[in-house]
Amino acid sequence: MALKDEFATRNFSIYGQWLGILSMILCFALGIANIFTFRPIIIVFSVITLCFSFVILFVEVPLLLRICPTSPTFDNLIRKISTNYTRAAAYGVMAVVVFLSCIDRTTSLLVPGIFLSFTGICYALAALKGQAFVGSKTLGGAGVAQMIV
């Protein structure tokens, strides 16, 4: 199934997975961009956002759990984020944490917060509509995702 066919299924978990990849890229890029400031609280939130980007990478591309040497504790944590409900909750928590960075001063970290929110909403819609989680074949395939989980 091609990427166009995956989007045509109207399964919100596919939309969530691709928005998650976009969120990961934004968290990484804007996390690095906001480290170079003189405000310590922004630096802390930038590092947290950078950490979120790596967590999202392992959540959305489960094949990496097999390839990269990680601890069993980290593997178990990532494997718990496997259903649409848990993914929606995880992205919701990450979005709230990133939005908290705007307490001190509004920065470009607002953008990853918005995309993390959209990703959480997509996974929540998939869960509420009763749609099963479907992994994109482009990002490792559904068969690979079930083999790892």
Curated annotation (Swiss-Prot):
Highest taxon above the source species: Eukaryota
Pfam families from the UniProt entry: Cg6151-P (PF10233)
Glycan-modified residues: 11
Bilayer topology: Multi-pass membrane protein
GO biological process terms held by the UniProt record: vesicle-mediated transport
Subcellular localization: Golgi apparatus membrane
Name of the protein this chain belongs to: Golgi apparatus membrane protein tvp-18
Organism of this sequence: Neurospora crassa (strain ATCC 24698 / 74-OR23-1A / CBS 708.71 / DSM 1257 / FGSC 987)
Gene coding for it: tvp-18
